Amino acid sequence: ASNRGVPCSFYRTKDPIHGPYEEIKGTMEYWDPNLFLDDDGRMYFYWGCDNRTPIWGVELDPQTMSPIGEKKDLIKGNPWSRGYERFGENHSENPRSEAEIDVCFAKFLEDCGERAKDIPKENYDMIRTTFANLPYIEGAWMTKHDRKYYLQYACPGAEINVYADGVYI
């Protein structure tokens, strides 16, 4: 379960097939999550799915599922230095400048018969950013192999031929 704008609950059980499941009320909102239990018993939580925000991580208390400390920015999209994060067929599109975004956004508003001042601020930023050609950083997944940690993620967008996986070791 995940939700933007609303704290999300966790569910746990000792028997995933038959249950019962216990709901643990959430204390934070998240989208596209991954839960990682390290072999030392510490639990970590990773999430993010956006072209405006990073993949975050935080340690969780395994009993309460509450964060221990503050969330940390772990991976931010950077199509200028990681070419596999560039949009477009065959990674052919660079991020747009603010002026180019303004032109695309104005055309979108005109085509929809909308006025910028009538769009709520949270929707305005989200819609406008879709024209930036910035990569969607999503699908965080932590793996440990031979005492090394691999934080994997997907980008730039599932709708094009160059959907890719990146990894930080």
Regions found by a protein language model. Name each.
Residues A1-I169:
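Carbohydrate-active catalytic/glycan-binding domains of CAZyme proteins
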